[in-house]
């Protein structure tokens, strides 16, 4: 049973001291077997209590049962106080009942006017020890706390929000059964490095090998294989990001959300930086290029209408993915195109792709740039991989 604190709200701000004569006067209104005593030192409020009680702090309050508290029908004061504790909600006392009627004395008497709102507040939940998760070769502690829950037979516990795993327990004290719910909190991961701090746990969790309360956390049998496949697929992506991160001077955030554009950039970065492999992709029907003054392309500027033309264009730019921006050299190779516009004055070239057109791209780290010739690019394209076929597998060298 919970202990309770009593709070009385009133407008007085000056302390008063009781006297024997004053108490005698007030106690004339007290029924037989009861007496009024000052509520606490310095207060001007007197509470009605049993005459034979030895408790230092006690008071009498009135309830009218049955009553509804937090959606539950309550029929006795013990359950009301218990439910107040379990829900961490105050009990607001009925002022009419406390003031007394039909000859009943008031439960509180103030020397300076009417007593205002009266409430009983529960004591806070105690702090709990963390729960321990275990798997072969590893362990993890998760802080938990008791959650207010409107029930006289069930207790709810949840993990603290800032953790890799969200855990929720619902204990039924009547039948001693426990309902357990767990979910991975991916928002806890800030960087790709954070993922690898918890990778061993996440892998064992996906395989149903983590123990909690001496039991395995298991996934439903009908989706267990799918969960494992999803973990393996995502794990390859995260490993690719870690490998890319090792090649650039930037920390990569953990991908909470991925756009198709992000995925495609990561694929090309992975094949270029890790596998040293050209990526083949589908180009737009029309390609526009603008060349600067230093370009020697104008020396062999093609004429409009020329067919079966190939073009190799390296240029420097910043690519953005997952809120990261990195400088690269992007090498583009297009085969079998037709010249639609060739503007020598503005140095603009517009090509149309043909049905046999092939398009290739290869990224280079701008800080480690080594110029690639068109012949080298043509040689590299022989081992090119289709963009859609990239699964973040590392080539054996």
Curated annotation (Swiss-Prot):
InterPro entries: AbiGii-like (IPR053703), AbiGii_2 (IPR031707). It comes from the Bacteria. Confers resistance to phages by a mechanism of abortive infection. Seems to act by interfering with phage RNA synthesis. Does not act at the level of phage DNA synthesis. Coiled coil: none annotated. This is Abortive phage resistance protein AbiGii. The gene is abiGII. NCBIfam families: phage_res_AbiGII (NF042958). Keywords: Plasmid.
């Amino acid at each position: 049973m919970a202990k309770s604190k009593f709070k009385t709200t009133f407008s007085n701000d000056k302390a008063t001291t009781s006297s024997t004569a004053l108490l005698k006067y007030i106690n004339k209104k007290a029924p037989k077997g009861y007496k009024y005593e000052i509520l606490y030192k310095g207060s001007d409020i007197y509470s009605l209590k049993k005459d034979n009680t030895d408790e230092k702090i006690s008071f009498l309050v009135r309830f009218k049962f049955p009553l509804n508290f937090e959606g539950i029908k309550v029929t006795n004061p013990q359950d009301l106080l218990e439910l107040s504790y379990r829900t961490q909600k105050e009990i607001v006392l009925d002022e009419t009942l406390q003031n007394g009627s039909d000859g009943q004395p008031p439960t509180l008497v103030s020397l300076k006017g009417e007593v205002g709102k009266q409430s009983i507040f529960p004591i806070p939940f105690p702090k709990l020890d963390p729960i321990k998760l275990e798997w072969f070769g590893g362990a993890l502690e998760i802080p938990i706390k008791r959650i207010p829950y409107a029930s006289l037979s069930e207790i709810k516990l949840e993990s603290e929000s800032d953790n890799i795993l969200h855990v929720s327990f619902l204990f039924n004290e009547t039948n001693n059964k426990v309902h357990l719910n767990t979910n991975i909190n991916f928002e806890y991961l800030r960087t790709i490095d954070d993922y690898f701090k918890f990778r061993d746990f996440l892998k064992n969790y996906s395989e149903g090998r983590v123990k909690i309360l001496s039991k395995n956390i298991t996934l439903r049998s009908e989706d267990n294989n799918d969960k494992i496949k999803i973990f393996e697929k995502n794990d390859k992506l995260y490993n690719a990001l870690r490998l890319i991160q090792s090649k650039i001077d930037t920390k990569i955030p953990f991908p909470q959300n991925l756009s198709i554009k992000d995925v495609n950039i990561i694929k090309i970065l992975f094949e270029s930086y890790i596998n040293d492999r050209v990526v083949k992709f589908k180009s737009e029907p029309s390609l526009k290029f603008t060349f600067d003054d230093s370009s020697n392309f104008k020396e062999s500027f093609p004429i409009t209408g020329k067919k079966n033309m190939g073009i190799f264009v390296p240029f420097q730019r910043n690519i953005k993915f997952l809120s990261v921006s990195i400088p690269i050299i992007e090498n583009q190779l297009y085969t079998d195109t037709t010249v639609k516009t060739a503007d020598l004055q503005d140095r603009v070239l517009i090509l149309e792709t043909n049905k046999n057109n092939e398009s290739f791209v290869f990224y280079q780290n701008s800080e480690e740039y080594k110029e690639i010739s068109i012949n080298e690019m043509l040689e590299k394209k022989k081992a090119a991989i289709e963009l859609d076929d990239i699964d973040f597998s590392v080539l054996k060298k």
